[in-house]
């Protein structure tokens, strides 16, 4: 059996994601495992309030871990309700939307920060969405 880089904790019945795609993206960028939580709007709002003091839901959160040998890179939390809503609104699949949010969260775990860098995160997102034939990235949509 192949070792997985991603450990999934799904608190919902959402299943519209491609684990092989996410494993491929992850292994391209890191050899450290990643924890992935899939939650609903209510749980995401609670996490956002607790850890960022922002009392509203969001689509993706990242929680990096310290550089401890054999420890995961960190945790990515994706809001399944937002995935479904945004995919429908933008006219692409929930699997594609999930992959975009996963990439966004993974890049944050790797130290990229679109709020303070000089476009490096946006460039890396664009590279990955082209390579994996995904729709426009979260950052690109934000700036349009």
Swiss-Prot record:
Required co-factors: Zn(2+)
GO BP annotations, alphabetical order: rRNA processing
This enzyme's EC code(s): 3.1.-.-
InterPro entries recorded: MetalPrtase_cat_dom_sf_prd, YbeY, YbeY_CS
Keywords assigned by UniProt, alphabetized: Cytoplasm, Endonuclease, Hydrolase, Metal-binding, Nuclease, Ribosome biogenesis, rRNA processing, Zinc
Gene Ontology cellular component terms for the protein in this record: cytoplasm
GO molecular function: metalloendopeptidase activity; RNA endonuclease activity; zinc ion binding
Superkingdom of source: Bacteria
The UniProt record lists the keyword Secreted: no
Co-factor: note: Binds 1 zinc ion.
Keyword rRNA-binding attributed: no
Primary role: Single strand-specific metallo-endoribonuclease involved in late-stage 70S ribosome quality control and in maturation of the 3' terminus of the 16S rRNA.
Protein family (similarity comment): Belongs to the endoribonuclease YbeY family.
Protein name as it appears in the record: Endoribonuclease YbeY
Name of encoding gene: ybeY
